[in-house]
């Protein structure tokens, strides 16, 4: 909507309406929305120590928090420069090659390595938005805005999962996490952005 040039009052109005709808749905239909373990993942972020007794048993609590707990420890143990890609102390994180690849990067390459990885992704997002802003075709602008926004949201959610700020929902880190369908769709998105860029760049041969 922002890329289409709509007024902020319409965008904020739509956001407020969506927020109200979600609040009403949770207030009256919370018992029918989501499965038990999905709620546990949300509650594990809000109350990781289970002080409110949201988990029915200690075994369930430990199982729910285990992956994020190990990921947090792995990132923290990496320090500034990490423990080395093939050496040093490594903290095992379940399925680290998927959703928690950032925890492995943090453990191996440290804070600096994470900054480099996220910096590359940030540059890609900025370039995507810039390509859309320079596009003379509205469709091209919409494509770049949508892809840039989706990438930005995906990166933010994955980082939040790894830092234990958001619940685990299976969102990958673009271009770094394993996953055939995810990588395929990302390359398709990059191809679309490159197509928009090429159609708005003068040819060297006139």
Model-predicted segments: where are they?
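Transmembrane helix-bundle signature of multi-pass membrane transporters/permeases
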Residues: 16, 92-93, 104-107, 147-151, ...
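Hydrophobic, glycine- and aromatic-enriched re-entrant/interface helices and adjoining loop segments
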Residues: 12-114, 138-140
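Structural signal for the C-terminal ends of transmembrane alpha-helices
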Residues: 1-8, 122-132, 193-201
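A juxtamembrane structural motif centered on a specific transmembrane helix
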Residues: 154-206
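Alpha-helical membrane-inserting segments
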Residues: 3, 20-28, 153-156, 160
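Membrane-interfacial segments
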Residues: 7, 28, 32-33, 129-136, ...
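Hydrophobic transmembrane alpha-helices and their immediate junctions
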Residues: 111-155
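Transmembrane alpha-helix boundary/anchor motif
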Residues: 23-24, 33, 37, 120-127, ...
